[in-house]
Amino acid sequence: HAEINKFISQKKDGEMDSADVRYLKTIIRQGEARTACNYINVKPENVHFLNLPFYETGTIKKGDLGRADVDIVKALIEEVKPHQIFVAGDLADPHGTHKVCLDAVLAAIDEIKDEKWMQDCRIWMYRGAWAEWEIDHIEMAVPLSPEELRQKRNSILKHQSQMENAPFLGDDERLFWQRSEDRNRATAELYSRLGLASYEAIEAFVEYHPIRGCLLYTSP
């Protein structure tokens, strides 16, 4: 504890975190994720932390996607054999980690897309707090009731280490959960103005369609 406090107090800008600090950050973030999952009734045995190598740089800037990252993601998908995969398609993420994670998932999917069980698997991309899909691109719109929107907000708030001053491309000073909630409400309002049913909020998804029979995605 004393060594960690000393390191943090003397750390210089851009300096790599020590192994102890990286471990502490991992424990904090995994604990927050478990708390959020428990809140929305996700069973502990269904929570997996991949600890992808590209992320373990010890600095804000993460590494490039590597073969080991793709293999880890592919192994989990092959183990679970899901009917649906939900992946962050938020390419405006200031740190770029969502883009690398998306690339890892798509590269893994591209390598196993011709497996028989994958024919029944659908891949849905969602946006975070920074932007929303154009309405003509949306392929699945999930209505949220006021209570469901509160549940989403509360689950986001379980990630306490991420609540203040989340980076954003621009001068928007709203907190992450506020931007997310406003985005969901704005999507619902847009559907309402188009003459469709009115809801408190809507979560929108775009489907990723793998092209079967050939390898298109160049993995590391």
Model features per residue range: what roles?
Residues 51-53, 127-129, 145:
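Residues at the C-termini of beta-strands that transition into short coil/loop
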